[in-house]
Amino acid sequence: MIKEMAIANNADEVDNEVRAEKGRKCFYLKKMIGDYIGNTVRIVATVVLADFLQRLYRSVVEYVHCSKYYLPEDRLWTILRRSCTYSNKSRYLVMGFILIGFLRISVSGNYKDVVPTFKFLAYMPLYWIFSNLGHSTLTYSSWVRDSHGLDYAAGMASNYFHGYLKLSLPERKADGLLHRMNVYEDKYNVTFGIKRLIILIPDEMFINGVIQSRILEKATPLETQFINRAGVNRPFKHAVYRLAEKVNGKTYYFAMEGATPMLSFFEAMHSNFSATWQMKELKREIWLKFYTHLNELIKTWPETRNLVELIIYNSHDTKGDLVDVGEMLKSHMELKTKNIDEMIG
């Protein structure tokens, strides 16, 4: 009997030790999770404070040394507004950590668990030193691709559209692109393959003054259009090319030109006075963004959406040979006439 009681007591002691061990593990686990959450909130609070102080410092420097970029009456407000601009992602993250901080305080009952101590604040200079560590050429690439209208490519596309295409193409006083093309067809008894202005955008960005092709011949241009622009009666001209090889027994003409801003950018890249390594490194991003933004402007504006045909292409084929623009147009017309024949048939 006594032996059985001793065995039972030993079993109880073992059970108690097991429960105590589980309790200790559970306690340490909860403490570890609580400390992790508290330290995470402290680190985030330290980073936010360091960022705020950095923005404040830059605001002071901007106010003192860059006053010429602001109007006197709203200089302070504009600088503060710009310095306190945060992305939506940053705002949501900070709000999330603030919520986590309040939850931590509600559990522990001690606000000191989430307030940064001097040990954390002492690391703020590291943020100031390494805050630009994440910047790279990829950062510039992402910035160029964003839709803000401030990059080189979007600026070229906007100037090209608002200063040229939007002025010369729409119909105003019987001088729009379609009217001039119809007059041209009647006058010379020809047919345009595409009743739009074709704009070539090769990735090489270079286009000769006369578009080179084995099967393209330069013809008489469309009638010159004169438009008053900023006090100057500017002439607007559109070149016309004849496809030397017939498609289904018919000769086609095309109003066609290269994207002049791309040619200007090509020249800027190869000039010792204006070229930068960033321009050369990101030229493909600029080329694609120019096309994307210009296409968006053309499609958005009602007067131009059906008047322009953008052709973006690689200047060289897989063998390294120059792509023949005339061959591209011929293939396009062959496909177009084939589809029409199939519809009729």
Swiss-Prot record:
Claim: Hydrolase is one of the keywords in the record: no
Annotated consequence of substituting residue 164 to F: Does not affect binding to 3',2'-cGAMP and subsequent activation
Binding site for 3',2'-cGAMP: 159, 234, 237, 257, 260, 264
Transmembrane segments: 90-107, 122-144
Disulfide bonds, paired cysteine numbers: none
Matches recorded under InterPro entries: STING, STING_C, STING_C_sf, STING_LBD, STING_TM
Entry keywords, A to Z: Antiviral defense, Endoplasmic reticulum, Glycoprotein, Immunity, Innate immunity, Membrane, Nucleotide-binding, Transmembrane, Transmembrane helix
Gene3D superfamilies the record matches: Stimulator of interferon genes protein
Cellular component, GO annotation: autophagosome; endoplasmic reticulum membrane
Membrane topology of this protein: Multi-pass membrane protein
Location(s), subcellular: Endoplasmic reticulum membrane
Top-level taxonomic group: Eukaryota
GO process annotations (BP): activation of innate immune response; autophagosome assembly; defense response to virus; innate immune response; positive regulation of macroautophagy; positive regulation of peptidoglycan recognition protein signaling pathway; positive regulation of type I interferon production; reticulophagy
Outcome (variant: residue 257 to Q/A): Impaired binding to 3',2'-cGAMP
Glycosylated position list: 88, 189, 272
Assigned protein family: Belongs to the STING family.
Function: Facilitator of innate immune signaling that binds cyclic dinucleotides produced in response to infection by bacteria and/or viruses, and promotes the activation of the NF-kappa-B transcription factor Rel (Relish). Recognizes and binds cyclic di-GMP (c-di-GMP), a cyclic dinucleotide messenger produced by bacteria such as L.monocytogenes, leading to activation of the peptidoglycan recognition protein (IMD) signaling pathway and activation of Rel (Relish).
Protein name: Stimulator of interferon genes protein homolog
